Regions:
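Core transmembrane alpha-helical segments of multi-pass membrane transporters/permeases
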Residues: 26-34, 38, 62-111, 297-366
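Hydrophobic alpha-helical transmembrane segments of multi-pass integral membrane proteins
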Residues: 94-95, 122-153, 158, 347-356, ...
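Membrane-interfacial loop-to-helix junctions in multi-pass transporters
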Residues: 72-73, 85-91, 118-129, 163-165, ...
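Interfacial/capping segments of alpha-helical transmembrane domains
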Residues: 46-74, 187-190, 284-292, 363-372, ...
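Membrane-core helix-loop-helix motifs of multi-pass transport proteins
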Residues: 20, 149, 153-243, 250-258, ...
Length: 508
């Protein structure tokens, strides 16, 4: 069945069809990044030959593009090829997480858990459930981007709905809403530190706390859950039509063995969480900062991903033994090998992606583009609401081409934070604008390592899906999320509500 079932007379149907056709003409991601590397090399050579540079408005230093085709570029590239690949942070994190999450899936824990959760939810509200769980999963940082999409598909299968709709709803929650959190997470810590440093250029006493965006971001979870659910139910799933997959994939009932396994896994989960809590909650807890005894930052926050992997391993092992999925010691490595095999295509794709990102950074093209575009926005004299929209759109554009959100904010914050402070706005308010833009376009960013991962998840249920298919399906979420989120922030600003404890959009 075609993914695009809206009649051709529908303008939205024509748009999705156009996106799918254009996207499907794109080469395989591996080749796409090879071509991008060639374009990048030629571009740096031309800009370098003509001595083109940009002036950093914060300190007046020139931002010069370095020539990748020069002798200097060759001397940098050859010794760093392997380092660029093996040191690519998302690759390390994703492969490690797949060991844990893949084991949980292979022993049957995740499917059984999703069936258990879905059994208490009416199929009508499955979209909202998936989105809410996805938002809550942000506590696991990038791990959520790996774990939640397959979970979303399984939940929809369990309630008899189209798994691709559940997959896309989960991608929207963990991707488009990546920085919307009920709890304080690592993103708050990272971005607030960058904002504080940027604000110091204007006011050395200004400090952006990790909780300065909390009220707005927690409220965003509620709004975006409703919006995302409506998009899934009213736009996405009608386009997919009736699920024609194997009926055996509809996980509708649990065996007594699975129920027993879930009970054992639940007990082990509680014991694991209690053990971690004993190392974090007490003031002298061993996972707190050894000097300041704080939770943020602390070894606990820095080690959240390894702890998640260990959690999956321990709980999956308990479930597997209880259900006799794991009968011998040799079963354990075999169960962990299978999900790693599925990552082969992702690993191959990451090689040119990692080289492209490293070359983009070394050549200063990222800084050059960011400074040039921000100069245009600054020189146009935009202020107030136009400045809000300008920063959001600029950030969205840059996030499409630079994989690291923190890297982009490191470039933009020294320019826009002082600029917004001069206009009378709190730096935490500028930070929210960036977070909205960064999150909204994450599932679309061609340089994101998660896009091919999401495509791989989609191909489980639609083997002939290509990049264009993926883009045409996921497109409504980024577009609508960005507009709704900005309107929500505008309303927040006009009403004068606090964006965090004691923090308002405008400086007092």
């Amino acid at each position: 069945m075609s993914m695009s079932s809206i009649p051709s007379s529908s303008q939205s149907g024509k748009l999705y069809g156009w996106v799918e056709r254009i996207g499907n003409k794109l080469p395989h991601p591996f080749l796409l990044f090879i071509y991008l590397i060639i374009v990048l090399m030629v571009t740096t050579a031309i800009l370098s030959a003509f001595g083109v540079s940009a002036k950093n408005p914060t300190d007046g230093t020139p931002v010069v593009v370095k020539n990748l085709l020069s002798v200097e570029g060759l001397h940098w590239f050859l010794p760093n090829v392997i380092k660029n690949f093996s040191g690519f942070a998302p690759l390390r994190a994703i492969l490690a997480l797949v060991l844990g999450a893949g084991l949980a899936e292979r022993v049957g824990l995740l499917p059984a858990l999703m069936v258990k959760m879905a059994s208490h939810v009416n199929a009508r509200y499955a979209s909202y459930m998936v989105l809410f769980i996805a938002f809550f999963s942000h506590i696991s940082s990038d791990a959520a981007l790996v774990i939640m999409p397959p979970m979303g598909a399984l939940i929809f299968l369990a309630v008899g709905r189209h798994p691709v709709a559940g997959l896309l709803a989960a991608i929207a929650g963990v991707g488009c809403g990546f920085t919307a959190n009920l709890l304080i997470v690592t993103t708050d810590v990272l971005l607030s530190g960058i904002s504080t440093e940027a604000a110091a250029a204007f006011n050395p006493q200004m400090h952006v706390s990790v909780i300065d965006n909390w009220y707005f971001m927690a409220s965003s979870v509620v709004v975006l859950t409703i919006v995302g659910g409506l998009i899934t139910d009213k736009i996405i799933e009608p386009r997919l039509g009736q699920w024609q997959g194997n009926s055996d994939e509809k996980l509708q009932t649990l065996t007594e063995s699975q129920r027993f396994g879930l009970r054992i896994a639940g007990v082990v989960s509680l014991l694991f969480i209690a053990a971690i809590a004993l190392m974090v909650i007490p003031e002298n807890g061993i996972l707190r900062d050894p000097i300041n005894h704080t939770v943020m930052p602390s070894p606990f926050i820095k080690g959240i991903v390894p702890l998640i992997i260990l959690f999956f391993f321990v709980v999956s092992l308990a479930y597997g033994i209880a259900t006799r999925t794991i009968r011998r010691q040799a079963d354990l490595p075999h169960l962990m090998i299978e999900p790693m095999k599925e990552m082969a295509g992702f690993i191959v794709m990451v090689f040119p992606l990692a080289q492209f990102v490293a070359m983009f950074n070394w050549s200063n093209m990222g800084k050059f583009i960011a400074v040039g575009l921000t100069d245009i926005l600054e020189s146009s004299g935009l202020s107030g609401i136009p400045a809000f929209v300008g920063l959001a759109l600029l950030s969205s554009f840059l996030c499409m081409f630079i994989a690291s959100g923190s890297a982009i904010w490191s470039i933009l914050a020294p320019i826009f934070v002082p600029m917004f402070m001069l206009l009378g706005f709190h730096p935490a308010f500028a930070q929210i604008l960036f977070r909205i833009a960064d999150s909204s376009v994450l599932p679309l960013a061609p340089v994101s390592p998660f896009v091919p991962l999401f495509l791989g998840f989609l191909q489980r249920y639609k083997p002939d899906a290509k990049l264009g298919t993926y883009y045409s399906l996921v497109l409504p979420y980024p577009l609508i999320f960005l507009v709704v989120w900005l309107l929500m922030l505008l309303a927040w600003y006009l009403v004068g509500l606090p964006i965090g404890p004691g923090i308002y959009p405008r400086l007092s």
